[in-house]
Amino acid sequence: MVDNRTVEQRLAAVAASMTMAGYTMTKADREESRRILRGEVSADESVRQVLADAGRDAADLVGKTAFRRLSELESSRPLTVFTRETLLATHAYLCGDVYPWAGTIRTSEVGAMGLAMCRAAYVDQELDRLFRRIEQSPPSATDREAALNTVAEHWGELTIIHPFLDGNSRTQRYFFDHMLRHAGWSLDWRRIAAAEVHAARYVAAATLDSSLLVDALRPGLSTGEDCPQLPTEPAAVLFHRMMEFRRAHPHESFHKLFFADKQSDKLRQPARDNQNG
């Protein structure tokens, strides 16, 4: 029997993927995910019930099936091989209940966060180039910062390559989470703002600066004492804030400066209120 702490930690990882995909899990969704994570029901059985409801629209259907598949993956044997083939297989598993093209490279142009992604004609070769880098530069098993920097760089590159028409965020969160896990690290997504990670991925994709993604992931590998205040804004808002912050404060930490300033504003607010009163 899986203990409740493990179930909740895995549920947070599933919910993070879905948040990045623009799908907010309902209370009922979370309870169904827990049932799968506990082994009380199989993902296959749960997905069959969803697919039997012909009244759902495609976007809702893809979200409902994907979180169930992610729940099963999170409760199964961890991913230990990080190749083009395992990325495609992961995508096929997560999205194949709805998309017949799941697990295949896109052949049309796409964009996200107002950015044009890699041209479809170059996705194949760029994906091969990235996976050569991943093979040559796995995350450190002894240096936390080095491990985060390596994964953030790879993640930013895969974000701009954007190999699939849909389902990139769900697949990539699982893929890079397990890459860190395989190196001996564990991300606790209860202590990470998924929207911030999502925004920072696109900053890394647009600028080749993955430091904000490192900032966003670091709290999940930190002790409670050094866990910074986490942002609550949507990913699209955070993306623009990050881009502005990066231009104004190059090489500075988004968390250390931006959120420290927000905290200072809160501390100053009572003083202003007292003056007004």
Where do the protein language model's features map onto the residues?
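FIC/Doc superfamily catalytic core
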Residues: M1-G277
